[in-house]
Amino acid sequence: SICEYIDAHCTEDITLDEIAKIAGFSKYHFTRLFKQFTNNTFYKYLNQKRIELALTFLADPNISVTEAAMQSGFANPSTFIRVFKAEKGCTPTEFRKMFTG
């Protein structure tokens, strides 16, 4: 399924255009269908998958926040921190302190 594809490739630089093409739909039609079936936008779903992955990296004190961001598929640490805070209500560093505290 498309969700399985996104899950498997979430660390890559995948775009809405690319996924819509793989699914065989226009970007507009894919966006509507994806929202209907997942109750999420494509980018929200993708970011949630990336954050799930980042949580495992953040649990390892040997992996920096920047490294966790890059290994999770985020283009840069600032985007990662912004998305992480929106999803989890705290920064990655704050999360790590709570997790390892």
Across the structure, where does each feature detected by a protein language model lie?
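Pre-recognition alpha-helix immediately N-terminal to the DNA-recognition helix
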Residues: 1-5, 52-56
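Basic/polar phosphate-binding segments, predominantly the helix-turn-helix DNA-binding elements
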Residues: 5-7, 13-49, 63, 69-94, ...
